[in-house]
């Protein structure tokens, strides 16, 4: 049976792609045939090959299962706005079935493990009736939560964790990502979350100037995920 993990964050721009990419590299190092799946992206660049999202490209490159871009990122939109608004403007529709069909295609392509990266935070609208979290719940995918270390992260992390658990989904682990070179009382914030979050702590991502170019293998403990 193919294993999947869904990467969510306490906010947008907290390092979901960085963590997803790092996890993929770790799984590859363990000899697991894995793929990245970024089903929804906005803010894509126009290229000769079509719309391309940097986050999705990074997942595509980190995986050891070679897949065409459109399989990694089936819903790609150019405007850097909420995806459901971008989809409406493009006269497109993001559907639960479409998301599931994309995941099934990757599974059938030979993946043993799929790292699925969400968009935005946990409650990302797909339209006026559905959320991306509805799909994660439908697929029953264990969740990995990325906490962006900044003022307010305690509340954001606890709210996100509670929302995931309220959807009856397991939190397979969580990661603290240092967004800035310095943060007042960073260690105290981390220690507080380690005491309050009843889920495996997979590790810390240090602050780096070019995070998406950094090789952070060895920073995360994937043993709880294997």
From Swiss-Prot:
Would you identify the family this protein belongs to, as annotated?
Belongs to the dethiobiotin synthetase family.
Q: Which UniProt keywords apply?
A: ATP-binding, Biotin biosynthesis, Cytoplasm, Ligase, Magnesium, Metal-binding, Nucleotide-binding
Catalytic activity annotated for this protein?
Answer: (7R,8S)-7,8-diammoniononanoate + CO2 + ATP = (4R,5S)-dethiobiotin + ADP + phosphate + 3 H(+)
Enzyme active site: 38
Pfam families xref list: AAA_26
User: Which NCBIfam families does this UniProt record tie to the protein?
Assistant: bioD
> Assembly and interactions?
Homodimer.
The protein's matches in SUPFAM superfamilies, at most eight in alphabetical order, are given as: P-loop containing nucleoside triphosphate hydrolases
Pathway the protein takes part in? Cofactor biosynthesis; biotin biosynthesis; biotin from 7,8-diaminononanoate: step 1/2
Quick one: which residues bind ATP? Answer: 13-18, 55, 117-120, 177-178, 206-208, 213
Where on the tree of life does the source sit, at the highest rank?
Bacteria
What does the UniProt function comment say about this protein?
Catalyzes a mechanistically unusual reaction, the ATP-dependent insertion of CO2 between the N7 and N8 nitrogen atoms of 7,8-diaminopelargonic acid (DAPA, also called 7,8-diammoniononanoate) to form a ureido ring.
Binding-site residues, Mg(2+): 17, 55, 117
Q: Residues of the signal sequence?
A: none
Name this protein carries in UniProt: ATP-dependent dethiobiotin synthetase BioD
Task: Report the CDD domains cross-referenced here.
Answer: DTBS
| InterPro entries (UniProt xref) | DTB_synth_BioD (IPR004472), P-loop_NTPase (IPR027417)
């Amino acid at each position: 049976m193919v294993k999947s993990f869904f990467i969510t964050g306490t906010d947008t721009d907290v390092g979901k792609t960085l963590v997803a990419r790092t996890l993929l590299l770790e799984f590859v190092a363990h000899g697991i045939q894995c793929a990245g799946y970024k089903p929804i992206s906005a803010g894509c660049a126009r290229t000769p090959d079509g719309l391309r999202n940097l986050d999705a490209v990074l997942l595509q490159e980190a995986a050891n299962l070679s897949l065409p871009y459109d399989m990694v990122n089936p819903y790609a939109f150019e405007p850097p706005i909420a995806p459901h608004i971008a989809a409406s403007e493009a006269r497109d529709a993001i559907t639960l079935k479409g998301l599931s069909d994309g995941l099934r295609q990757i599974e059938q392509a030979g993946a043993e493990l799929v790292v699925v990266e969400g968009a935005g935070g946990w409650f990302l609208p797909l339209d006026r009736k559905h959320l991306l979290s509805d799909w994660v719940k439908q697929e029953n995918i264990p969740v990995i939560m990325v906490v962006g270390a900044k003022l307010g992260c305690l509340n954001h992390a606890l709210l996100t964790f509670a929302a995931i658990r309220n959807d009856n989904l397991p939190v397979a682990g969580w990661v603290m990502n240092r967004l800035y070179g310095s943060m007042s009382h960073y260690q105290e914030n981390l220690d507080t979350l380690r005491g309050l979050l009843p889920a495996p702590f997979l590790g810390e991502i240090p602050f780096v100037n070019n995070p998406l170019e950094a090789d952070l293998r060895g920073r995360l403990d994937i043993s709880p995920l294997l």
